[in-house]
Amino acid sequence: MSEPLAVDVVGNTLKYTSHAGIECLIDFNDILCVLSNHVPTHSVLFFQRTEPDGPKSEDFSLKKIDIESLPAALSPFVIKIPSHLRHEDEPPVIQVVVSSGSGTGKAKTIFQDVVRPLFTYIGLENYELYETLSAQTVGELTRSKFLERAHNGVPQTIILLSGDGGLVDILEAFYKSKTAIDVSPNIALIPCGTGNAMANSIGLRSGPVPGLSALLRGSPSSIPVFAAKFSPGSRLVIDEGRQRADIDTNVHHTLYGAVVASWGLHAALVADSDTFEYRKFGVDRFKMAANELLYPSDGTPPHQFKGKITLTTSKGPSEARSQEAVEELEHMYALATLVPRLEKEFLISPDSVPLDGQMRFIRFGPMSAEDAMHLMTLAYQGGRHVMEDTVTYAKIEQIRIDFQEDEERWRRVCIDGKIVAVERDGWVEICKERSRLLNLIN
């Protein structure tokens, strides 16, 4: 082990001379934490660009230096390893899931360059590592590993290097399981997807590698969930839109989610952009799919989605519930959500508080493509769209949609990224789930 280094604080940077005689600077914004070793020695863990000469590089690796003494300016960075990573009495089982297919494609690199070194630095030697082989891997892992441990009362922490899909797959398996949960697993998100709605909503947006600070400084909070029950003929859309599958193996036809349920423009965009025809265009597929929905190539106006929407509301836990149907039967955008953000800057529900369990409804009716784009732009400007007269924004307990569309493509519903094609004259009911079976580190 090399000798600890002498350091100085210069402005907002840490200055030191390496053992090779090179003068180095660490920006405070790049410091992850300070570990207390044997006083007075401390270790500074910090991010370093993997290509130091490329200022636009977004790839970082985690490095460590041992220092002789702790400057006062570094005191706020000192942490104690949290119990969800290391506990003297009953150590949790640490499981890392690396989703190789998630949006940015960087999950494996982030694990190798950042997460694995972190485990080494904090002395975490025993952990299980899983890399996804297909879209079914996380669900299979949950049924074979995570559920059994939760049922047997084994404390466990699941670190997901993935998009929202990894969390949704775990959630689905837990809520569809018939076994009782004795100890809820703690889930930590290291977001590697494109939207990362849950991670962005709970504030995992800071630092070179979002989510890592929360893993070290956060604590568990239970995750609120909604249940989406579909009419019996509804089918999951799979294989990039080419095939259909049963929603579940029982008669309930129910999916579970923690982020968003939508119909109309949002659901159609998610569904179309995930089809074989669009996926071959890579990241451009979202823009192309949106363009076709807003400016159809046959020259017609944007589609008017037909259906009856019924909202159930309540003024408080002990208050009676009331039902009210939306007057209009034609819609452009209808969405229920438990979170404020669908993307980092896309504030769809500004009144939402992460993990508080309140469901909110956002809707607007048929309008021109230009007016719809204006509303979406306002959502990127601090959620100002909800102040427009054309937008319905309300706190709800439940929503039911009875579809009145002939074509299947206008009867597709999005549940946390999964697409369901509802049968003709079918319906969906989305309501808040009472039980909370999973915890999120935040």
Across the structure, where does each feature detected by a protein language model lie?
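Catalytic phosphate-donor-binding core of small-molecule kinases
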Residues: Y16, L215-G218, A289-I309, P340-R341, ...
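Short hydrophobic-aromatic micro-motifs
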Residues: T254-A261, A267-V270, M332-T337, R360-R363, ...
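Eukaryotic short linear interaction motifs
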Residues: G103-K106, T137-G139, G166-V168, G195-A197, ...
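Generic C-terminus detector
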Residues: T50-P55, I67-S75, E397, Q404-N442
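ATP/NTP phosphate-donor binding region
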Residues: M1-L161, V168, E172-T179
